[in-house]
Amino acid sequence: MEFEAEHEGLTASWVAPAPQGGKGAEGRAGVADEAGHGKTEAECAEDGEKCGDAEMSALDRVQRDRWRFSSPPPHSGVTGKGAIPIKGDGKAIECQELTGEGEWLSQWEELPPEPRRSGNEHLDESRYAKQTERGSSTGKEEGDGMKQMGELAQQCEGGTYADLLVEAEQAVVHSVRALMLAERQNPNILGEHLNKKRVLVQRPRTILSVESENATMRSYMLVTLICSAKSLLLGSCMSFFAGMLVGRTADVKTPLWDTVCLLMAFCAGIVVGGVDSGEVESGETKSESN
């Protein structure tokens, strides 16, 4: 496939053969112009010498640029994707387009221009414009860019960072799935192995567990208060009705006897209420233990 250089006006130098000499000798010999009018032999020689020197200097530059920017040899390892593209400051590269970077850097002192396909297929104009503006960079920046590019080329041989990241993510997902499957199938065996592997197994206290404990304590205190109020109310009622019944049956007019009966009924009510509350509390402890 034919490539075009189009770098600093060197399109002709990409395909043209190396110059085999200039026109300075012909100028010095006094060759006249094509028309052959209005000039003597000395004037023709002088003009030809000046023109020949100018053309020789331009051709020397073209020959030098041709040596620097010519296409890579067939054994260099560079495929049809072309030379190594440079972005922005000349330091960032694309790993997927590095094919023969080692041999290329060993044979060429500078990076060649980015070639363009003859049909302009898949052409990124902005990247090419940035690449053509690279002429203002200094030699030190170019050396640093080549060194960094060599390091990135070595890293790209074993896979890019994206590939390594994807492999790590897949390994983590696989490990989590295997752990979940083992915990579902054999939770006891898994717990035993974990207890053997770990020095101290502690279950961390989360915010949810702390709030649950606080709610349990509040509910327990509320139940205890309700049971105590129930016992007091029941004892008071029993003592009141027992005092009325005992007072009518004995038919005693003394207030001392009424007071004694009232105290006895009150004590009996307290005892009955305490037994009732104890049964409730024992039932709660059994439910909590279960």
From Swiss-Prot:
One annotated Gene Ontology cellular component of this protein: membrane
Bilayer topology term: Multi-pass membrane protein
Keyword annotations of the record: Membrane, Phosphoprotein, Transmembrane, Transmembrane helix
Protein name: 38 kDa phosphoprotein
Transmembrane found in the keyword field: yes
Further details from the record: Expressed in both lytically infected cells and latently infected lymphoblastoid tumor cells.
Subcellular location: Membrane
Underlying gene: PP38
Species, as recorded: Gallid herpesvirus 2 (strain MD11/75C/R2)
Ranges that cross the membrane: 226-246, 255-275
PTM section of the record: Phosphorylated.
Transferase as UniProt keyword: no
One family name in Pfam for this protein: Herpes_pp38
Biased composition (Basic and acidic residues): 34-49, 113-145
Region (Disordered): 1-49, 67-87, 111-146
